[in-house]
Amino acid sequence: MNLRDFFVITTWWGKILGAFFGYLTAGPVGALFGILVGNFFDRGLVSYYSNPHWLYHAEKQRIVQKAFFEATFSIMGHVAKSDGRVSEQEISMAKSIMNEMKLSKGQKDLAKRLFNEGKQADFNVSLALIQLQRICKDNRDLLKLFVDIQYRAAQVDGLSSQKIHALDNIFTHLGFAPLHKQYRFYEDFGSYFQQEQSKQHYHNQQEYKHTSSSQGQQGYKPQSPPNTLAHAFALLEVSPNANKQEVRRAYRRLLSRNHPDKLIAQGLPEEMIKLANDKTHQIMKAYELICETKGW
């Protein structure tokens, strides 16, 4: 007998407990009053657990959890293989995420199988992302956590152009801006960005080396990644010119949206609670940095 059947079929617990505690408190009169209160309690439980929406939401949550778990590791394998080779660092990162989630042996075996499936050339990444987006379309905070996990795994041994293309594909399928517009990732993305711009600068110098030195000095200069403070504002999703109240509201809103209990209610597998806590910690550190820098 499951929890729903217990409360639907067994409808007298409230009356018994009400009568017992009522009798202890006020004797026979208290027992009668306790039965009355317990009856309302029983009726409320029966009404709640008999409601078909309860069963629907419970089933939907299980579907979301399954889809999120499967997509997390299969897409992770796809991104790792996107540049042709899965490095030891990427394998270690995948194992680290499994350990953080405190997966059982069976769950780890499933996660490894999904990771390997994602590495295969015939893996249909578009179909996997479409299914995830369809199932989690009402849980955008879950999807944001999903892309955060994928980015974290992808950048462990450096971002290549192939990985960035794979990440952009993930982001756009799920309704997010491409990586170069995801300001909250710039702190890590900046090193790759500088390298690519330096290569382009060198290429321009070689291509136009026959021009005058003054013209050569006017060539393209690599851009520096934004500073840590700008990254903190980006994490809180506010403008660097935002005032104290705007920053505080954004901070509280993000804490609420990324609260582990809320994400679990939306369908986040309980094994991924550690990853949600990491996201909350990043938000808190960003807010602390802004307040300290601004003197708030």
Curated annotation (Swiss-Prot):
Keyword flag Transmembrane: yes
Keyword Transmembrane: yes
Keyword entries, A-Z: Cell inner membrane, Cell membrane, Chaperone, Membrane, Transmembrane, Transmembrane helix
Gene Ontology MF terms in the entry: protein-folding chaperone binding
Membrane disposition: Single-pass type III membrane protein
Residue ranges crossing the lipid bilayer per the database entry: 16-39
Spans annotated as Disordered: 200-225
Periplasmic side: 1-15
Subcellular location: Cell inner membrane
Polar residues bias: start-end ranges: 211-221
Cellular component aspect of the GO annotation: plasma membrane
Boundaries of every J domain copy: 231-296
Cytoplasmic side: 40-296
Subunit relationships: Homodimer.
Biological function: Regulatory DnaK co-chaperone. Direct interaction between DnaK and DjlA is needed for the induction of the wcaABCDE operon, involved in the synthesis of a colanic acid polysaccharide capsule, possibly through activation of the RcsB/RcsC phosphotransfer signaling pathway. The colanic acid capsule may help the bacterium survive conditions outside the host.
Comment, domains: The transmembrane domain is a dimerization domain.
Protein name: Co-chaperone protein DjlA
Source organism: Legionella pneumophila subsp. pneumophila (strain Philadelphia 1 / ATCC 33152 / DSM 7513)
